From Swiss-Prot:
Name of protein: Large ribosomal subunit protein uL23
TM region(s), chain numbering: none
Function field: One of the early assembly proteins it binds 23S rRNA. One of the proteins that surrounds the polypeptide exit tunnel on the outside of the ribosome. Forms the main docking site for trigger factor binding to the ribosome.
Matching Pfam families: Ribosomal_L23
Subunit-level organization: Part of the 50S ribosomal subunit. Contacts protein L29, and trigger factor when it is bound to the ribosome.
Molecular function in Gene Ontology: rRNA binding; structural constituent of ribosome
Chain's gene name: rplW
Family according to the record: Belongs to the universal ribosomal protein uL23 family.
Species assigned in the record: Rhizobium rhizogenes (strain K84 / ATCC BAA-868)
NCBIfam families membership: PRK05738.1-3, PRK05738.1-5, PRK05738.2-4
GO cellular component, one term: ribosome
GO terms (BP aspect): translation
Length: 97
């Protein structure tokens, strides 16, 4: 049985035009918790999906400042992880966990 904290590390798959292009290179993009480290992300992906991870790259997208009817607000910051899988392995992110 998978450890429940793995579900706290991986928030959701990031399904965008760029992330679908990365699937040609055996890479998958996930939104992850801001406090998640690369070893935690690697362990979570390997445990939840049963694949071998070769590399994890992370980035922090800062939220934009938005205005609506004169009020200033801010979007949330999002941490993304680009996970490189071993050759011949893949993850279908369109299905749920």
């Amino acid at each position: 049985m998978t450890d429940l904290r793995h579900y706290d590390v991986i928030v959701s798959p990031a399904i965008t035009e760029k992330s679908t292009l990365l699937s040609d290179n055996n890479q998958v993009v996930f939104n992850v918790a801001k406090t998640a480290t690369k070893p935690e992300i690697k362990a979570a992906v390997e445990a939840l999906f049963g694949v071998k991870v070769t590399a994890v790259n992370t980035l922090l997208r800062l939220g934009k400042t938005k205005r609506f009817k004169g009020l200033v607000g801010k979007q949330k910051d999002v941490k993304k992880a680009i996970v490189t899988l071993a050759e011949g392995q893949s993850i279908d992110v369109s299905t749920g966990l």
